[in-house]
């Protein structure tokens, strides 16, 4: 029988409040395999992020979408003072495990990890005088749906995130190239700029429209899982994640508004300066905002 319900996430994943799309544990486990550890980060990404933070004299960093902690671990290893938060306790357990395993290293013993929600971030996180940099990378912000249909929760979340940045500090936030996805129905053909994973076998893209407006993009991942076959051979695991399709122009307006317009803003396409109409089609847009007041 045909399933008449369009499932936006893998079964067992929470659907109330800010959705934890990794709540069943299995998606979190497979995602950890997919992204790997800090060694699986591309050299280009690592060099770009570390260079950006050091160029602006950043030391105290808030990772507002730390997931399993892979970016935070990289920053802690590089000498930054890091606070890491995420709404998914299933994802955070991997970060907490790494901190425990490396607790004898002072930098890891001082690493702060908390569960927090973007919609209540101003209450969940004590920012003090603000962080030198706040990062929200890996298409993480697109996990927040537009439940009310007016993007009010997007605006609230971005305002809360921006409030964590000290005057003169940075917000670094990204999203996939949804302009391309919505116009073609598939993701750009380039490589993943963040992960060197060789376990991905297939990613299927679907676009859900409501009243002729793109409302959601779902990605169905098929990932090779080593040693799960009956004879010890690799098996396969599938899971679905849903995202709000932020287009470049509209997201630019949202994120600038979060700072009340008091910011310097630049857009990169796959870590390179982006110019509308350029020949190269980026997989990700990265927004770098410097708070000016």
Curated annotation (Swiss-Prot):
List of residues that carry Phosphoserine: 10
Superkingdom, taxonomy of origin: Eukaryota
The keyword Phosphoprotein belongs to this UniProt entry's keyword annotation: yes
Residue ranges of coiled coil: none
Protein name: Glycine N-methyltransferase
Biological-process GO terms, alphabetical: glycogen metabolic process; methionine metabolic process; methylation; one-carbon metabolic process; protein homotetramerization; regulation of gluconeogenesis; S-adenosylmethionine metabolic process
Binding site for (6S)-5-methyl-5,6,7,8-tetrahydrofolate 1: 4, 6, 240
Gene3D superfamilies hit by this protein: Glycine N-methyltransferase, chain A, domain 1 (3.30.46.10), Vaccinia Virus protein VP39 (3.40.50.150)
Keywords, comma-separated and alphabetical: Acetylation, Cytoplasm, Folate-binding, Methyltransferase, Phosphoprotein, S-adenosyl-L-methionine, Transferase
UniProt-annotated binding residues for (6S)-5-methyl-5,6,7,8-tetrahydrofolate 2: 6, 215, 240
Location of this chain's protein in the cell: Cytoplasm
The organism of origin for this protein: Mus musculus
Record-listed S-adenosyl-L-methionine binding positions: 22, 31, 34, 41, 65, 86-88, 117-118, 137-140, 176, 221
Biological function: Catalyzes the methylation of glycine by using S-adenosylmethionine (AdoMet) to form N-methylglycine (sarcosine) with the concomitant production of S-adenosylhomocysteine (AdoHcy), a reaction regulated by the binding of 5-methyltetrahydrofolate. Plays an important role in the regulation of methyl group metabolism by regulating the ratio between S-adenosyl-L-methionine and S-adenosyl-L-homocysteine.
Keyword Cell cycle: no
Primary enzyme class: transferase
InterPro entries: Gly/Sar_N_MeTrfase, Methyltranfer_dom, SAM-dependent_MTases_sf
Assembly notes: Homotetramer.
EC numbers on record: 2.1.1.20
Modified residue annotations for N-acetylvaline: 2
Effect of gene knockout: Deficient mice are fertile and display elevated levels of methionine and S-adenosylmethionine in the liver. At 3 and 8 months of age, the livers at 3 and 8 months of age show evidence of fatty accumulation and fibrosis that worsen progressively.
Broad class of where this protein is predominantly found: cytoplasm
Pfam families: Methyltransf_31
Activity regulation as described: Inhibited by 5-methyltetrahydrofolate monoglutamate and by 5-methyltetrahydrofolate pentaglutamate, inhibition is much more effective by the pentaglutamate form than by the monoglutamate form. Two molecules of 5-methyltetrahydrofolate are bound per tetramer. The binding sites are localized between subunits. Inhibitor binding may preclude movements of the polypeptide chain that are necessary for enzyme activity.
Lineage: Eukaryota, Metazoa, Chordata, Craniata, Vertebrata
N6-succinyllysine, modified sites: 46, 191, 196, 201
């Amino acid at each position: 029988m045909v399933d008449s319900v369009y499932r936006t996430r893998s079964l067992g994943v929470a659907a109330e409040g800010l959705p934890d799309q990794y709540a069943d544990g299995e998606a979190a486990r497979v995602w950890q395999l997919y992204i790997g550890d800090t060694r699986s980060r591309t050299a280009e990404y690592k060099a770009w992020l570390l260079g950006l933070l050091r160029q602006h004299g950043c030391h105290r960093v808030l990772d507002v979408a730390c997931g399993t902690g892979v970016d935070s671990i990289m920053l802690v290893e590089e000498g930054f003072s890091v606070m890491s938060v995420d709404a998914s306790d299933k994802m955070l357990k991997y970060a907490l495990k790494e901190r425990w395993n490396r607790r004898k290293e002072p930098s890891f013993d001082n690493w702060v990890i908390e569960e927090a929600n973007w919609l209540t971030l101003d209450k969940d996180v004590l920012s003090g005088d603000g962080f030198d940099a706040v990062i929200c990378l890996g298409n993480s912000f697109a996990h927040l749906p537009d439940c009310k249909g007016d993007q009010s929760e997007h605006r609230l979340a971005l305002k809360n995130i921006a409030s964590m940045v000290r005057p003169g500090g940075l917000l670094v936030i990204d999203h996939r190239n949804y302009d391309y996805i919505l116009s073609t129905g598939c993701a750009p053909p380039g490589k993943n700029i963040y992960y060197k994973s060789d376990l991905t076998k297939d990613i299927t893209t679907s676009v859900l429209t409501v009243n002729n407006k793109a409302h959601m993009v779902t990605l169905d991942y098929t990932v090779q899982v080593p040693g799960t076959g009956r004879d010890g051979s690799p098996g396969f695991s599938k899971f679905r994640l849903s995202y709000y399709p932020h287009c470049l122009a509209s997201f630019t307006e949202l994120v600038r508004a979060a700072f009340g317009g008091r910011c310097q803003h630049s857009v990169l396409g796959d870590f390179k300066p982006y110019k509308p109409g350029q020949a190269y089609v980026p997989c990700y847009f990265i927004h770098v905002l410097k708070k000016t007041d």
